[in-house]
Amino acid sequence: MMTLNFATQVRQMKAIAGQPDYALGSVHAVTREGTLFIASASGSQLASYAWGAANVIFVVGAQKLVPTRDAARERIFQHSLKLEDARALVAYGQHSSIGKILEIDREQPGRTHIVLIQQTVGF
């Protein structure tokens, strides 16, 4: 993908990025029932998580476990966004925002794997 020109080949870049064999990432919250919540400013990573990738692996810190969907949304807006906003301001000189939130309730058997760790990872 690095050899493609963003100005003239953005469609090809999106096609490649949206259909990888594997997607590795994290989530912002996991409910007691197992619903995964992933927030994004642009949504660029969400397509592969939701459908495009053949296999998805999420590494999730135990601090992201919450009891309910409402608690997951509250965690995203009151915790994750605040930390990401501060990081983006230093890194890019601009504020962050949440443009999209993906909720995953059910998945094809064997497609998505969660690695739950005790270490604090991400926001």
Regions found by a protein language model. Name each.
Residues 17-123:
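Conserved phosphate- and dinucleotide-binding cores of soluble alpha/beta proteins
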Residues 1-27:
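N-terminal active-site beta-alpha-beta segment that forms phosphate/nucleotide-binding
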